[in-house]
Design a protein with these regions (language model features):
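A short beta-turn/loop motif at secondary-structure boundaries
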Residues: 24-28, 105
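Charged, amphipathic alpha-helical segments and their flanking helix caps
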Residues: 1-20, 36-123
Length: 123
């Protein structure tokens, strides 16, 4: 998973400068992205299916979600059906679901896009 994490992190950073794995620091500037691998299923050989969550976070002064929606659309345009490769693996991402999330802090706006990533190991 280390190689997949590194590959995805670099790719998301090419889309948006503030990208974090699992948890953003409390000092993170909005808007930002947080990604995680929530489930990994292996066939026992060189194929794995990975559920990848990409969460967009924003705290707009006026509550308007346009910037967040634009960010998430940009992420999806770049990631959906995209194949990334590095030494030892190739992975293709497919959008599965889009979920608007409510945060305990009513000023924060969130969107979660869940991707099914199909990962192939290479010998």
């Amino acid at each position: 998973m280390k190689n997949l994490r590194k590959l995805l992190h670099l790719y998301l950073k090419s889309i948006h400068p503030r990208v974090y794995f699992q948890v953003a620091p409390e000092t993170a500037q909005f808007p930002y992205l947080v990604y995680d691998f929530t489930q990994i299923t292996s066939d026992g050989e060189e194929f794995e299916t990975v559920a990848v969550d990409v969460d967009g976070w924003d705290m707009p002064a006026n509550g308007n979600t346009t910037a967040l929606e634009t960010l998430m659309q940009t992420v999806n345009d770049a990631l959906n059906k995209k194949t990334l490769t590095t030494e030892g693996l190739a992975v293709t991402f497919y959008l599965d679901r889009k979920i608007p999330l409510l945060d305990d802090n009513k000023k924060i706006r969130r969107r979660k896009y869940i991707y099914e990533a199909r990962l192939f190991g290479r010998s």
